[in-house]
């Protein structure tokens, strides 16, 4: 798929670091990589920027096609771009969308801002042109207590100005903090004040003074190379399980806000709504499922059949229904060839079995508008499209 360039000139903006699974929180373009352009900063829309959006905290494995599909479901897009590291090709966790109609841009913010995708909660907002006052406002912080949370990190730095994004790096296997974080302020002068106030200080719980400096310091090139190797490692993995209760709370809020969805059943979900639990990768840690005839299992993940969609349903409905539960590879609404209306069903492919099963257990029986959804793993029975 060819992608149109954005009207926004991003080549003149300051470089950032890629956002990968080494973070314990969703990343924005708040880090320090010299191989990519910096995003435009978020802020109030002007007359010239009411169609231009910046999207932060995207999942590391989200593709450009999925990015376009998600935002294209809202309205006609003039251009969009998922920003990648120029050397490694890895997604940096943010992108830009430029709509033709300002109303669609506003709708995208109202509908998709705060949407949970995999382990991240995306942030959708208007973009504003970069300027000297907001360039180079990224800070690198080391020596943090291993017990410090992202919220505590923000509380520590928030006294110096408005924080755009923050993150703490964690060990990919254990999920334990590496004691290193990043803070992006709204303005460079705020970052300068934070350096003056906190560099060499000992925050609560710290045994050693912390180091606070600008993230784009050339001396960090070796760290950038190490991060790039980590991102490209085939053995990397996301730490820890997803917190499904938090996701479920987010789903209820999102569906009620966007579609007026109400849970049809007040009691527990019937056992038939959720297939027996087993590992999608191995059985007893030894036997691969490749080649086994298991409902819903495909070469790219777990395919879910969604039935009783309304004729006006599109891909955005499926994205918003299933995104809160985990990694969604792709979605597809089956349409009538003549009318281009939804034929009443669609498919969602999710990477992880547990996440797919949780989505089925939660969404089977949901009332979407005046229809009750039937959600299950796809069987081998062919569905005519």
From Swiss-Prot:
Q: Which terms in the GO cellular component ontology are assigned?
A: axon; cytoplasm; dendrite; growth cone; perikaryon; ribonucleoprotein complex
GO MF terms here are:
mRNA 3'-UTR AU-rich region binding; mRNA 3'-UTR binding; mRNA binding; poly(A) binding; pre-mRNA intronic pyrimidine-rich binding
One Pfam entry for this protein is: RRM_1
Q: Which residues carry this modification: Phosphoserine?
A: 38, 233
Q: Which UniProt keywords apply?
A: Cell projection, Cytoplasm, Methylation, mRNA processing, mRNA splicing, Phosphoprotein, Repeat, RNA-binding
Following inactivation of the gene, the phenotype reported is:
Transiently impaired neurite extensions of several cranial nerves, including glossopharyngeal nerve, hypoglossal nerve, trigeminal nerve and acousticofacial nerves in the midembryonic nervous system at 10.5 dpc, however no developmental delays of the nervous system in later-stage embryos at 14 dpc are obvious. By postnatal weeks 4 to 8, 70-80% of the mice exhibit an abnormal clasping reflex of the hind limbs upon being suspended by the tail. Decreased motor coordination, as impaired performance on an accelerating rotarod is observed.
Entry PTM: Methylated by CARM1, which leads to reduced RNA-binding activity and enhanced interaction with SMN. Methylation at Arg-248 by CARM1 weakens protective binding to the 3'UTR of CDKN1A mRNA and down-regulates CDKN1A protein expression, thereby maintaining cells in a proliferative state. Methylation is inhibited by NGF, which facilitates neurite outgrowth.
The record ties this protein, via SMART domains, to: RRM
So what does mutating residue 277 to A actually do?
No impact on interaction with EIF4A
Chief location: cytoplasm
Q: Per the UniProt record, which residue ranges are transmembrane?
A: none
Classification via InterPro entries: ELAD_HU_SF, HuD_RRM3, Hud_Sxl_RNA, Nucleotide-bd_a/b_plait_sf, RBD_domain_sf, RRM_dom
One GO BP annotation is: RNA splicing
Question: Ranges of Low complexity compositional bias?
Answer: 18-33
Effect the entry attributes to changing residue 280 to A: No impact on interaction with EIF4A
> What domain of life is recorded for the organism?
Eukaryota
Ranges for region Disordered: 12-48
Where would I find the RRM domain in this sequence? 51-129, 137-217, 302-380
Question: Sorted alphabetically, which NCBIfam families does this protein's record hold?
Answer: ELAV_HUD_SF
Q: Which family does it belong to?
A: Belongs to the RRM elav family.
Assembly and interactions?
Component of a TAU mRNP complex, at least composed of IGF2BP1, ELAVL4 and G3BP. Associates with the EIF4F cap-binding complex, composed of EIF4G, EIF4A, EIF4E and PABP. Within the EIF4F cap-binding complex, interacts with EIF4A. Interacts with SMN (via Tudor domain) in an RNA-independent manner; the interaction is required for localization of ELAVL4 to RNA granules. Interacts with MAP1 light chain LC1 (via C-terminus); the interaction contributes to the association of ELAVL4 with microtubules. Interacts with MAP1 light chain LC2.
Per the record, the domain comment is: The RRM 3 domain is required for binding to poly(A) RNA, for the association with polysomes and with the EIF4F cap-binding complex and for the stimulation of translation. The RRM 1 and RRM 2 domains may contribute to polysome association and stimulation of translation.
Question: Know the name of this protein?
Answer: ELAV-like protein 4
Q: What is the lineage of its organism?
A: Eukaryota, Metazoa, Chordata, Craniata, Vertebrata
What gene makes this protein? Elavl4
């Amino acid at each position: 798929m060819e992608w149109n360039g954005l009207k926004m000139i991003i080549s003149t903006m300051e470089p950032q670091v890629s956002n990968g699974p080494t973070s314990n929180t969703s990343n924005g373009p708040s880090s320090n990589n010299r191989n990519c352009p910096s995003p435009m900063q978020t802020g109030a829309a002007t007359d010239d920027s009411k169609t231009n959006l910046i999207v932060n905290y995207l999942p590391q494995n989200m593709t450009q096609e999925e990015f376009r599909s998600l935002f294209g479901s809202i309205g006609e897009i003039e251009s969009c771009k998922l920003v990648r590291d120029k050397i490694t090709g890895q997604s940096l966790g943010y992108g830009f969308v430029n709509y033709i109609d300002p109303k669609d841009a506003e709708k995208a913010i109202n509908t998709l801002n705060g949407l949970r995708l995999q382990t991240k909660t995306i942030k959708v907002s208007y973009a504003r042109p970069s300027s000297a006052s907001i360039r180079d406002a990224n800070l690198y912080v080391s020596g943090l207590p291993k017990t410090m949370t992202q919220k505590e990190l923000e509380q520590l730095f928030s006294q110096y100005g408005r924080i755009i994004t923050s993150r703490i790096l964690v060990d990919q296997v254990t999920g334990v903090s590496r004691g290193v974080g990043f803070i992006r302020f709204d303005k460079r002068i705020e970052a300068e004040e934070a350096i003056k106030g906190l560099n060499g200080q000992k925050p609560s719980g710290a045994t050693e003074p912390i180091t606070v400096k600008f993230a784009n310091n050339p001396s960090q090139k070796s760290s950038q190379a190490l991060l790039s190797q980590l991102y490209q490692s085939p053995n990397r993995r996301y730490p820890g399980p997803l917190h499904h209760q938090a996701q479920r709370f987010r789903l209820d809020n999102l569906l009620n806000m966007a579609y007026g969805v109400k849970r049809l059943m007040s009691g527990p979900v019937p056992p038939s709504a959720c297939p027996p639990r087993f590992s999608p990768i191995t059985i007893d840690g030894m036997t691969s499922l490749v080649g086994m005839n298991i409902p819903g299992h495909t070469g790219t993940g777990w395919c879910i059949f969604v039935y009783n969609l309304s004729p006006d349903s599109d891909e955005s409905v499926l994205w918003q229904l299933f995104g809160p539960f985990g990694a969604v590879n792709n979605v597809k609404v089956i349409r009538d060839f003549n009318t281009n209306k939804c034929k009443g069903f669609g498919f969602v492919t999710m990477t992880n079995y547990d996440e797919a099963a949780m989505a089925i257990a939660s969404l089977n029986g949901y009332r979407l508008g005046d229809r009750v959804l039937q959600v299950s793993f796809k069987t081998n029975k062919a569905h005519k499209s």
